[in-house]
Regions:
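Histidine-centered active-site/metal-ligand motif
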Residues: 4
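H/E-rich (His + Asp/Glu) clusters that bind or coordinate divalent metals
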Residues: 9-138
Length: 138
């Protein structure tokens, strides 16, 4: 299980992001070729601190999540909050303010699924529960 969306770190929309994203993309592309590798779509603030307060940063997160869904497919991606390890936050990497709440995160991710991620009901069922149920055998 690959956590935190593959751990590309502290993107902010600057020129330096391109090299980080290319290195991340090369790694996750290779990992996605391995059928037993799954990925958690978690700790989004670890990737892009402040994404909840900045539309441009949120767009970066959406793009990364969309790319992971395309690489791994919904059956190997799972929504995760990193609760309780990071408290009630997904934007905390111990450098940021702890937000959003779990409810806000879920609502935001759901809106992405219905909107820019374009996931149908079957794909959403996998990302929000089915993938975890299968992976963890619950």
């Amino acid at each position: 299980m690959l956590d935190h969306a593959g751990k590309v770190r502290k993107l902010d929309g600057s020129e330096g992001d391109a090299a980080k994203i290319e290195a991340w993309r090369a790694g996750v592309t290779q990992l996605a070729k391995l059928p037993h590798v799954h990925i958690k779509l978690s700790m989004l603030g670890f990737l892009v601190p402040g994404w909840t307060d900045d539309a441009a940063k949120e767009a970066i997160v959406i793009g990364l999540v969309k790319e992971l869904l395309e690489l791994f497919g919904p059956s190997r991606c799972m929504f995760a909050s990193n609760w309780h390890g990071s408290g009630a936050s997904s934007n905390a990497d111990y450098c940021d303010e702890c937000q959003p709440t779990m409810t806000e995160l879920y609502e935001k991710f759901q809106a992405w699924c219905d909107g820019p991620l374009g996931l149908d009901a079957e794909a959403q069922a996998l990302v929000f529960a089915g993938t975890a149920e299968a992976f963890y055998r619950i």
